[in-house]
Amino acid sequence: MADSSGSNPQSPGFTEKLKSWLCWSWTYICALWFAMVLTMVYVLRSPLKLQETVNAASVFLNTLTPKFYVALTGTSSLISGLILIFEWWYFRKYGTSFIEQVSVSHLRPLLGGVENSGSAGLFSSVNGDAEPRSNVAECKVWRNPLNLFRGAEYSRYTWVTGKEPLTYYDMNLSAQDHQTFFLGDTQQLRPEDSVMQKAWRERNPQARIRAAYQAIELNRECAAAYVLLAEEEATTITEAERLFKQALKSAGKDTNLVVYIKRRLAMCARKLGRIKEAVKMMRDLMKEFPLLGMLNIHENLLEALLELQAYADVQAVLAKYDDISLPKSATICYTSALLKARAVSDKFSPEAASRRGLSTAEMNAVEAIHRAVEFNPHVPKYLLEMKSLILPPEHILKRGDSEAVAYAFFHLQHWKRAEGALNLLHCTWEGTFRIIPYPLEKGHLFYPYPGCTETADRELLPSFHEVSVYPKKELPFFILFTAGLCSFCAMLAMLTHQFPELMGVFVKAFFSTLFAPLGFFADKMESFMPSCLWHQLTNV
């Protein structure tokens, strides 16, 4: 056993050396084989009647009219144009080149290539140590802590613009959340619970509302039905608050229902301007149910405290939740950056900073901004109003465009209120990308940026919104190649049609120049080798 264990480390090294030697030798064998084929073709040109074939081909080409060349180049331009259109459509939809994907996925394994682990960056920690992190974990979808009310807010947007702000995928996730949260114990379903279970799955809002009223007819104390009516039928926040209070009376001791309803009541108070009341309700909720931290109620609290401009209380909440062991969010990172930027932004000047350098406080603020931008690089474009905002989705993808939309929608006003904070952000946020030149492979303070955010964000955000992509993808080689080929063929077709004789002279000169090295090589071979040897070889 000892011998076998001792020989194992040497085996992989010998195997790798053998493989590299075979690859090296195979390259030269292929080159030698190609040279031998060319030599044999030249030697056997008389038995194979290659000269006669070439002469016949040249006669045929000389008899072709310019119209043939126009048709040929026009057809080539059309085909390459169709390929270009398909490649561009595929790239816009899936973010990759179709030809490149087929080559890597199907042709490369057949040719013996080893696939690079494209997701290797997703498994690397900040220090470069590999960790078993899967794409599913990286692209986990979270409930938006500040999600709007469908009836009182989302529906108003639809009435005004005629556009649907929520996708079916997003609403389907919400339906699953509600079924799990309110009807977790499927073994003891009451009749009204069965009705509500179907109601959450309905796509049509009116069908959901009718099912909620049906559940109330079965049981006047059905809290889940009042929750649905408050979320979807109430057209004002005041009406939604009244229905939530009715639901709270009927919730009894159902912890999930109580937490959900109290949180939404606090959000109603926040939207109606009773901010201190909302803060008190959120604090009480966090004290009463400390184990429900995954609901991210502290993000609601942070936003309300920022509205009160209670920055000391905001810092206290951050000190508790901005911990290395807890999952981060854009709210945590950017609120921390806002507090540090606020302390120096009113006196910050890029010209003065370039002359005297950054002070310690300014350096801390810049580092906090870099940290926030590394976590979610999409947020600054919305805060700086370089991209238009839309209504946030009900679910977000951390570090994705959906989270950036949700954060900026509620926090843009707080950044504007801090004098000079947006100016400091504008001057420094792009410096983050110099720290992390390859964000998909290695991060600086966080894990490498997940490569799956674009696909998930396209499912969460409506189609009329242009999803922000990071890092910005360059056009694949095959799109550029087909564009050049299409343009070149079209130009040749036009020139051949306009100047047929001149293009004919040009084509003949081009091919004469192209085959001149082959003729020179053949003459040298004939002068180098004895004529009797060629005669004997051709008679074999």
Curated annotation (Swiss-Prot):
SUPFAM superfamilies on file: TPR-like (SSF48452)
Q: Which UniProt keywords apply?
A: Membrane, Transmembrane, Transmembrane helix
GO cellular component terms attached to this protein's record: membrane
Q: Which residues cross the membrane?
A: 24-44, 68-88, 475-495, 502-522
How this chain sits in the membrane, per its record, is: Multi-pass membrane protein
Q: Which domain of life is it from?
A: Eukaryota
InterPro entries per record: ST7, TPR-like_helical_dom_sf
**Signal sequence annotation:** none
Q: Where in the cell is it found?
A: Membrane
- Pfam families to which the protein is assigned, alphabetical: ST7
Quick one: where is this thing mainly located? membrane
Q: Does the keyword Nucleus apply?
A: no
The record's listing under PANTHER family reads:
SUPPRESSION OF TUMORIGENICITY 7 (PTHR12745), SUPPRESSOR OF TUMORIGENICITY 7 PROTEIN-LIKE (PTHR12745:SF11)
Q: Which family does it belong to?
A: Belongs to the ST7 family.
Q: What protein does this entry describe? A: Suppressor of tumorigenicity 7 protein-like
